[in-house]
């Protein structure tokens, strides 16, 4: 198998169908952890393994420690992780199930748009954006995408913890609800890879 980062490098953008499938399997995997009171804290494409049949396995469970501001500023190593960190994680070192959902939302945004919503040339600026700016609506990057998909991503990536679903089980249920309302065109939507 390969990790999702490898697939992203190969494909650049994904269809709504592929994105929601991978997001769904990731949420499903996280749901068991959240029920057991475990938060992952470091959800990013590098930690999402796709087996030979393309199914998701989440790696690095429990290895990820909350990232302190000091480590963020002192090393560029964390730039990758910084792109997916939830605001409360950055500000208060607070690891929550909703923080995992935020990371999943950023990952989904990136799969659909072919780029992360916030970019910066250093981790400090990047985390500052996550704390002080709202994640742009996915429709800004993917015009014509289904409004329900956009709303679901907006909920996952809400800046305030309480505006996100409570945990991965709740998010998974919301996703299933959303999927039952998608048309064939909605499923097939894919942003043409921009060079």
Residue ranges and their predicted role:
Residues 3-14:
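AlphaC helix of the protein kinase catalytic domain
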Residues 183-195:
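Regulatory extensions appended to serine/threonine kinase catalytic cores
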Residues 26-38:
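Protein kinase catalytic-loop region centered on the HRD/HxD motif
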Residues 71-83, 90:
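Activation loop
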Residues 83-186:
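C-terminal lobe helix-coil module of Hanks-type protein kinase domains
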Residues 38-45, 50:
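Catalytic-loop of the protein kinase fold
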């Amino acid at each position: 198998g390969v990790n999702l980062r490898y697939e992203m490098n190969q494909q650049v953008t994904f269809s709504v169908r592929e994105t929601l499938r991978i997001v769904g399997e990731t949420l499903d995997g996280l749901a068991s952890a959240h029920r057991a009171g475990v938060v992952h804290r470091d959800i990013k494409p590098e930690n999402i393994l796709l087996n030979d049949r393309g199914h998701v396995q989440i790696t690095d469970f429990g290895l990820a420690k909350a990232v302190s501001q000091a480590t963020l500023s002192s090393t560029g190593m964390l730039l990758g992780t910084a792109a997916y960190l939830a605001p409360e994680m950055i500000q208060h070192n607070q690891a929550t199930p909703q923080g995992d959902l935020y990371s999943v939302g950023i990952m989904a945004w990136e799969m659909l748009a072919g780029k992360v919503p916030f970019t910066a040339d250093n981790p400090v600026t990047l985390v500052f954006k996550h704390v002080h700016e709202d994640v742009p609506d996915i429709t800004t990057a993917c015009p014509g995408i289904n409004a329900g998909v956009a709303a679901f991503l907006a909920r996952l990536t809400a800046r305030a913890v309480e505006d996100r679903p409570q945990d991965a089980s709740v998010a998974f249920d919301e996703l299933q609800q959303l999927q039952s309302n998608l048309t064939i065109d909605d499923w097939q939507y894919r942003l043409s890879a921009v060079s």
